[in-house]
Swiss-Prot record:
The lineage of its organism: Bacteria, Bacillati, Cyanobacteriota, Cyanophyceae, Synechococcales. Its main location: membrane. Keywords: ATP-binding, Cell inner membrane, Cell membrane, Membrane, Nucleotide-binding, Phosphonate transport, Translocase, Transport. It is an enzyme of class 7 (translocase). It comes from Synechococcus sp. (strain JA-2-3B'a(2-13)). CDD domains: ABC_PhnC_transporter. GO terms for molecular function: ABC-type phosphonate transporter activity; ATP binding; ATP hydrolysis activity. This is Phosphonates import ATP-binding protein PhnC 1. It is a peripheral membrane protein. PROSITE patterns: ABC_TRANSPORTER_1, ABC_TRANSPORTER_2, PHNC. ATP binds at G37, P38, S39, G40, A41, G42, K43, S44. Part of the ABC transporter complex PhnCDE involved in phosphonates import. Responsible for energy coupling to the transport system. Its EC number is 7.3.2.2.
């Protein structure tokens, strides 16, 4: 899996969300790349573009050699099969069971004429049950998804992404709606799964300590542009301060920043 971006622009009406973006990701052997930056910097837009949910306005993008900039329907269909998304707000279907929500991840691989849940294969069902066991929710398989806690729902989201057997997982702030204890559990589950299966992970995070603990590489966005792109060892505290507070740092900002490093 490799993501290549050349002079990417994305605009919505009169607002430019991404501009002059150049990136080459996962070609260096990194498995976990963290996207960071202030709110509204373009991180989520970039992820949704890679999932085929947002159209580019200019430039070129290749995902696993698929040319997204050409706008071909076949390329988009392949992209949706090869990429899986873990969302911030879980995106489960509350009236369906936990097992059925996991099976939703198999839909990109199914022909429309097969219908939905009546025609999943025995192999699909076995995979779903195995994944639910791995995330600690097998006993809840036939429970409605809307009866689960937030942390449990995100576990279902991870299982749904993994059953798709993707070449790339995109995670859009997967722990921002969780308390610190559940956030750590979810990150351990997600990172453990992708490392066992050798799946690259592109994840947006606001928890700086988790970036340091889990990421191999960091891409920082600021005002729609790439502010930093490189190994975690090169992303210094000075760069973090400049990213979030600019060149002129107030005393209050310095105290807040220092406190985040201690979390």
């Amino acid at each position: 899996m490799r993501i290549q971006v050349e002079n990417l622009w994305v605009a919505f009406k009169n607002k430019v969300a991404l501009r002059e973006v150049y990136l080459d990701l996962f070609g260096d052997g990194a498995q976990v790349v963290a996207l960071i930056g202030p709110s509204g910097a373009g991180k989520s837009t970039f992820l949704r573009l890679l999932k085929g949910m947002v159209k580019l306005s200019g430039g070129k993008v290749w995902v696993d050699s698929l040319p997204l900039h050409e706008g071909q329907r076949d390329a988009l269909q392949q992209l949706r099969r090869r990429t899986a998304m873990v969302y911030q707000t879980f995106q489960l279907i509350g009236r369906l069971t936990v097992l059925e929500n996991v099976l939703v991840g198999r839909l990109p691989h199914m022909s429309p004429i097969r219908g939905l849940f009546k025609h999943f294969s025995v192999q699909d069902l076995a995979k779903a049950e195995k994944l639910l066991e791995e995330v600690g929710l097998l006993e809840h398989a036939w429970q409605r998804a809307d009866a689960l806690s937030g942390g449990q729902q995100q576990r279902v989201g991870i299982a749904r992404a993994l059953i798709q057997e993707p070449a790339l997982i995109l995670a859009d702030e997967p722990i921002s709606a969780l308390d610190p204890k559940n956030a750590k559990v979810i990150m351990e589950l997600l990172l453990g799964a992708v490392r066992r299966q050798g799946i690259p992970l592109l994840v947006t995070l606001h928890h700086l300590e988790m970036v340091r603990h889990y990421a191999d590489r960091v891409v920082a966005f600021k005002e729609g542009q790439v502010f930093f792109n490189g190994p975690l060892s090169d992303f210094t505290s000075e760069k973090e301060k400049e990213l979030y507070f600019g060149e002129k740092e107030t005393h209050e900002a310095s105290e807040w920043f220092s406190s985040t490093l201690m979390v």
